[in-house]
């Protein structure tokens, strides 16, 4: 859990949102340990926490981070995840999961999150990953940030089995990603300018992601 928190801090995350749950107690312990560098905003409902993370991502252009527990925590966060997908907002939803040795045994509130949030949902998340080796946790976090930011921004779900958060590992925190900025081709901008100048009553709807001060 501490390794995950350190990976978030290394990527410039100073605020995360969530509803505390027993499925990711090790992360909460890490957040408390590093409370001078990262703030955990405890919410009363997972849907509200997801919306806060979505707003954070939308306003900053860097992934908003939300932690929820398994089962109802994840399902309640779905509305915020869907909003992030529809609005092209970078966001990462971390979901607690039953321990690996309890999978497929009808453990308490166990769900298959690749089925819940995966491609078959048509607009819920860009990628759903689940950590199966504690030593690969930094790799999964790095991929989550990369996927959320590259191309069309959007939400990512990373599932955290309990034992993956409590297993000691010497794995180092991976460096932060460098996001490639997408720009229109010069020819397309010239054509856009020509069309606007020719228009008698130009009307522009400005929205979506990727807008900066420049």
Each model region followed by its residue ranges:
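N-terminal alpha/beta PP-like core and its mobile active-site loop of ThDP/TPP-dependent enzymes
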Residues: 1-214
